[in-house]
Regions:
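All-alpha helical catalytic cores of prenyl diphosphate-utilizing isoprenoid enzymes
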Residues: 14-23, 37-46, 68-70, 102-212
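Amphipathic alpha-helical protein-interaction segments
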Residues: 69-76, 104, 254-257, 261-264
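Primarily interfacial, aromatic-capped hydrophobic alpha-helices that serve as membrane anchors
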Residues: 109-127, 224-273
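Short, charged, amphipathic alpha-helical segments
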Residues: 91-94, 119-123, 183-186, 277-285
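Acidic, Mg2+-coordinating active-site segments of isoprenoid diphosphate-utilizing enzymes
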Residues: 79-106, 166-177, 189-249
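C-terminal intrinsically disordered extensions
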Residues: 153-181, 266-299
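Conserved N-terminal diphosphate/IPP-binding helix and adjacent helical/loop segment
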Residues: 1-80, 84-86, 117-124, 138-147, ...
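Solvent-exposed loop and edge beta-strand segments that line ligand/cofactor-binding
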Residues: 34-42, 91-97, 151-156, 250-254
Length: 299
């Protein structure tokens, strides 16, 4: 886990404070998604991403703060939206989600970030979450087509909010998206997203299987079973967990996949390493954390 430096922790608290104040008068059920966002390491990373990018792509402090706040507003809105889609919140919470989206889009708009960029990435996130919901099972079994839909591209679409803040930063810095630096940052971000997701999927495998939740990690394990059996077949959660427990080669394969993704991220960032030390730190920490993948025991 990445430990924040004192200045980073102070910045995080500064950006959070308006949303915490806004939530104080709201019902606890609405505050809960915000608390989940504020407790999440990934959202701290989202919020600090402009700070870490700024030595490479300079922006003024006021622009960085607005970009961070817009990102955090969007994260709270997305958490409420997902809870509504998941049935954890009723649709009575939807107006607040829309208000937060408007606030987020307004902040991005004050920075002249293109609305089309935001709308496209929002559509990708919603479609990916609906796709995830469609793979949940109450029978403990998955059809091949359900798991085959959970691709690496789906993982990145699910995390499109991370790309929002990075692409907005690139745009505000006056760099084109096809610039070699922008391409390298996008490549590194995709690889880091996939590495983090794979590690999370393996750590959460037992809970996910019990709850009937599919994931990219579940899909990769299923593919190992299908290769051994000559083709895709209906598969249940017990077989997924069982294969993980009895197949050390599979565990090593996923650990190697994680290591390769971290190497790809590092390779993309290395030409700019002197300017983005905290991004380099993040990839190194992720690489080190991935060493536990092959030894995770679900029992």
């Amino acid at each position: 886990m990445l430990s924040l430096l004192p200045a980073e922790e102070a910045y995080w608290q500064q950006v959070c404070s308006p949303l915490i104040a806004l939530s104080a008068s709201l019902p606890p059920v609405i505050r809960c998604p915000l608390n989940q966002v504020l407790d999440s390491e990934i959202h701290r990373i989202f919020t600090l991403w402009p700070v870490w990018l700024s030595p490479l792509l300079p922006l003024t402090s006021s622009i960085i703060e607005r970009l961070s706040l817009a990102t955090l507003c969007g994260a709270w809105a997305a958490a409420i939206r997902d809870a509504c889609l998941d049935g954890e919140l009723t649709q009575t919470a939807a107006p607040l989600a829309r208000a937060l989206w408007r606030r987020s889009w307004h902040l991005f708009g004050t920075l002249a970030v293109h609305r089309e960029l935001l709308a496209d990435l929002e559509r990708r996130m919603v479609a990916a979450y609906r796709q995830e919901l469609a793979t949940r099972t109450h029978t403990g079994c998955w059809q091949p087509t359900q798991l085959q839909s959970l691709t690496a591209q789906w993982v990145c679409a699910r995390a499109a909010g991370w790309h929002v803040v990075q692409r907005a930063h690139i745009m505000l810095a006056g760099m084109k998206f096809d610039d070699p630096c922008a391409v390298a940052l996008s490549t590194a971000l995709d690889a880091l997203i996939l590495a983090r997701q794979l590690r999370d999927d393996v750590h959460d495998l037992a809970d996910d299987v019990r709850a009937g939740r599919a994931s990219w990690g579940v899909r990769l394990i299923a593919e190992s079973i299908w290769r051994a059996e000559g083709g895709p077949v209906l598969i249940d959660g017990q077989r997924i967990a069982g294969r993980w427990l009895i197949d050390p080669a599979l565990r090593q394969e996923l650990a190697s996949t994680h290591a390769t993704l971290c190497q790809q991220a590092m390779h993309a960032l290395m030409p700019y390493a002197a300017y983005i030390p905290r991004l380099i730190d993040l990839v190194m920490i992720e690489s080190e954390a991935g060493r536990t993948i092959a030894t995770i025991n679900l029992l």
